[in-house]
A protein has these predicted regions:
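Hydrophobic face of amphipathic alpha-helices that form TPR/SEL1-like repeat modules
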Residues: 26-33, 60-67, 96-103, 138-145, ...
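Short helix-capping/linker turns of helical repeat alpha-solenoids
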Residues: 21-22, 52-54, 67-69, 87-90, ...
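Alpha-helical segment of the N-proximal tetratricopeptide repeat
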Residues: 22-41, 45-48
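TPR/TPR-like (Sel1-like) alpha-helical repeat modules
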Residues: 111-126, 139, 152-172
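TPR-adjacent "capping" and linker segments in tetratricopeptide-repeat scaffold/adaptor proteins
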Residues: 10-25
Length: 195
């Protein structure tokens, strides 16, 4: 999937921005700054985009708060961002809330975490071509509830292979944060193939 606003060097084409809305321009420039490690600029641009009701920018702000990008870690603010974005079906926000309930960032609730992972998985099935979000949602179900994947008409092995391919694709496009996720996806695929 070639994004029309990214050129061969994985930099945003200024000429292509006229096809995007103002909030999308701020979002994409923020993502470019984030990948370059310029978190202050990324946060400023994400906030502008979120103020224009861009749900992805709101989700990305959640990551900045959760991981302490340019300010102290604030998991309460991360949760607030992700809850707002999850209402609109933002896949990363849904599974990150699931992580917070699974790993104890919020009062641990494995049943609710499971429900959130399942919701993210179902949303991702409708967005399988989006390698920036679908593999992460799939991976959580593969790690914790692989037996349920076939209930939706998919083979866990096929979903795991899709994850590996998708994560490799986004790394090739300049994603600097997916190395560990790729290792996890490969490990899950190998485990499934060995069963």
């Amino acid at each position: 999937m070639k994004l029309d606003y990214i050129n061969e060097e994985n930099k945003f084409n200024e000429d292509e921005f006229e096809e995007l809305t103002e909030d999308e321009i701020y979002l994409n420039k923020g993502a470019d700054a984030y990948q370059a490690g310029d978190y202050e600029t990324a946060i400023r641009l994400y906030q502008k985009s979120a103020d224009m009701e861009n749900i992805t920018a709101l989700s990305n702000l959640g990551y900045c708060y959760y991981y302490g990008r340019s300010f102290p870690v604030d998991k309460t603010k991360a949760k607030e961002c992700w809850e707002k974005a999850a209402i609109f079906g933002d896949i990363p926000s849904v599974y990150k809330l699931g992580d917070m309930y699974r790993y104890g960032d919020l009062p641990q609730n494995l049943d609710y975490s499971h429900a959130l992972y399942k919701r993210a998985f179902l949303l991702a099935l409708d967005n399988m071509d989006n390698y920036y979000v679908a593999p992460d949602a799939f991976l959580r179900m593969l790690k914790y509830y692989p037996e349920e994947i076939s209930d939706f008409g998919y083979s866990p092995i096929d979903i795991a292979a899709h994850c590996v391919i998708g994560i490799k694709d986004r790394i090739a496009r300049g994603d600097n944060y997916s190395g560990k996720v790729l290792s996890d996806a490969k490990a899950v695929l190998i485990k499934l193939l060995d069963e």
